[in-house]
């Protein structure tokens, strides 16, 4: 079945990446896509931007983050898989070279996933090096055409690897990835969404899940 992914929930109606936005999207979408980061005190937060008030998320504690945002802590602090009421694509935002913190990040998110979830990242190395650890699907993000050749080679070696592909790259004449393992992002025209789904991709990420 082809899937609709709510991009950070329903961002045109609710604050993106909040638990409320994600769960509202899951009432009408097959999946949600959300960004995950780790704090200095080893807590997971659902947040897209790498910084708050010019301070890296990874350099702030959870309590410090609450001082710089109006978002309620309960809406962004990810501690239990029960908080999200459906399938999720967790995009890992890796923004530190601290190996110990990254290892904790992987361990924590792995323990918070269901088998049908997806763990993905722009950091290919993190995904590829932890494939044996993940308890769910896993994928790499592609937003540059020059990544297509390498990702195609990897796809031949790993039949489980998924590909989260930026829309314009999906349309490239050099695109040869297995479509049934591709999730295309971010598509906000309803006709275009249906056209891409009809190409037998795994899914499409959209901001307009509530308008389809």
Question: Where are these predicted regions, by residue range?
Answer:
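Phosphate-group recognition and catalysis centered on beta-loop-alpha active-site segments
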Residues: 1-212
């Amino acid at each position: 079945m082809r899937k609709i992914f709510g991009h950070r929930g329903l961002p045109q109606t609710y604050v993106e990446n909040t638990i409320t936005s994600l769960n509202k999207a899951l009432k009408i979408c097959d999946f949600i896509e959300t960004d995950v980061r780790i704090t200095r005190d080893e807590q997971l937060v659902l947040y897209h931007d790498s910084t708050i008030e010019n301070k890296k998320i990874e350099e702030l504690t959870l309590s410090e983050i609450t001082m710089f945002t109006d978002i309620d802590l309960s809406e962004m602090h990810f501690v239990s898989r029960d908080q999200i009421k459906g399938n999720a694509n967790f995009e890992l935002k890796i923004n530190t070279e601290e190996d110990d913190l990254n290892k904790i990040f992987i361990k924590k998110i792995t323990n918070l996933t269901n088998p049908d979830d997806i763990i993905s990242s722009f950091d290919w190395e993190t995904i590829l090096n932890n494939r044996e650890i993940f308890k769910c699907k896993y994928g790499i993000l592609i937003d540059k055409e020059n990544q297509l050749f390498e990702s195609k080679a990897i796809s031949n070696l790993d039949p489980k690897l998924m590909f989260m592909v930026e829309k314009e790259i999906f349309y490239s004449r050099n695109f040869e990835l297995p479509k049934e393992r591709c999730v295309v992002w971010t598509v906000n025209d309803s006709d275009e969404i249906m056209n891409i789904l009809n190409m037998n991709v795994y899914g499409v990420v959209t901001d307009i899940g509530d308008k389809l």
